[in-house]
């Protein structure tokens, strides 16, 4: 019997529990067609206060989720769900559509990582298989997006819906804009991966140029549809190809 197994990694477990236990998803769990686990990321944090965030290197507003508790939570989830795809919900990710939801349903095992605050430390991406976005807008956290992924995939599992026609897809148009640049926070080195030197330099002009370059590169790589709509000045086109020593 086909079923979908998911583990949602979040700082706010109660935000997900209610939705997963209701309606079609609740019935799917009762029928054994959906197995949903919710993991509190703080269980993998250390110290009295189990801190999971810190200020971003290079300055800026907001806080960034630290790599240690997130990566350890992902590794523990992988041990529970061998072969699962690790999916980070992020505005920087590929757009969730019906085709991707079907891929998730067919794969059958997902670990969904919910971001918070200003984002997650870029070094966490080494433990992530893909990033997924539900649209060109920003939420206060990734929990709603993770629930969208579970809902969209679970309803494609045979037997979850009484009427298979209910799974018809809809299309949504995107809006123009750049994806966000990578974020980093303490420690300066994690498992051999170092924070880019420019973010530690204190040179705000270089930092802003680095962020602009990385945003342009991320958009070109992950959302070529958005990138194609941009009317970029020659300076941006040169910046995309510039090395760190040219910032």
Swiss-Prot record:
Q: Which reaction does it catalyse?
A: guanosine(37) in tRNA + S-adenosyl-L-methionine = N(1)-methylguanosine(37) in tRNA + S-adenosyl-L-homocysteine + H(+)
CDD domains under this entry?
A: TrmD-like
Per the annotation, which location comes first and is thus the protein's main one?
Answer: cytoplasm
Q: Where in the cell is it found?
A: Cytoplasm
Q: Per the UniProt record, which EC number(s) apply here? A: 2.1.1.228
Q: Which GO terms describe its cellular component?
A: cytosol
Summarize where S-adenosyl-L-methionine binds, as residue positions.
115, 134-139
Pfam annotation, one family: tRNA_m1G_MT
Q: Which residues form the signal peptide?
A: none
For biological process, the GO terms are:
tRNA N1-guanine methylation
Q: Name one GO molecular function term.
A: tRNA (guanine(37)-N1)-methyltransferase activity
Q: Which InterPro entries match?
A: Alpha/beta_knot_MTases (IPR029028), tRNA_m1G_MeTrfase_C_sf (IPR023148), tRNA_m1G_MeTrfase_TrmD (IPR002649), tRNA_m1G_MTases_N (IPR029026), tRNA_MeTrfase_TRMD/TRM10 (IPR016009)
Complex formation: Homodimer.
What does the function comment of this entry state?
Specifically methylates guanosine-37 in various tRNAs.
Listed NCBIfam families: PRK00026.1, trmD
HAMAP family in the cross-refs: TrmD
Q: What is this protein called?
A: tRNA (guanine-N(1)-)-methyltransferase
Source organism (scientific name):
Anaeromyxobacter sp. (strain K)
């Amino acid at each position: 019997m086909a079923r979908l197994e998911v583990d949602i990694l979040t700082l706010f477990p109660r935000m997900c529990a209610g939705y997963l236990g209701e309606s079609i998803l609740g019935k799917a769990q009762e029928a054994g067609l959906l197995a949903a686990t919710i993991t509190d990321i703080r269980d993998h944090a250390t110290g009295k206060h189990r801190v999971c965030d810190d200020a971003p290197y290079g300055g800026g507003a907001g806080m960034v989720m630290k790599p240690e508790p997130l990566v350890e939570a992902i590794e523990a989830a992988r041990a529970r769900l061998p072969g699962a795809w690790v999916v980070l919900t992020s505005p920087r990710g590929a757009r969730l559509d019906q085709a991707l939801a079907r891929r998730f349903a067919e794969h059958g095992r997902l670990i969904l990582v919910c971001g918070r605050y200003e984002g997650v430390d870029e070094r966490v991406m080494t433990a992530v298989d893909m990033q997924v976005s539900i649209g060109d807008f920003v939420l206060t956290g990734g929990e709603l997006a993770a629930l969208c992924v579970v809902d969209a995939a679970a309803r494609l599992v045979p037997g979850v819906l009484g009427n298979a026609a209910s799974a018809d897809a809809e299309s949504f148009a995107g809006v123009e804009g750049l994806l966000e640049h990578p974020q980093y926070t303490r420690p300066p080195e994690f498992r051999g991966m170092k924070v880019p030197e420019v973010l530690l330099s204190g040179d705000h002009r270089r930092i802003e140029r680095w962020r602009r370059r990385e945003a342009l590169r991320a958009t070109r790589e992950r959302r070529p549809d958005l990138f194609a709509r941009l009317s970029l000045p020659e300076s941006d086109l040169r910046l995309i190809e510039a090395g760190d020593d040219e910032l």
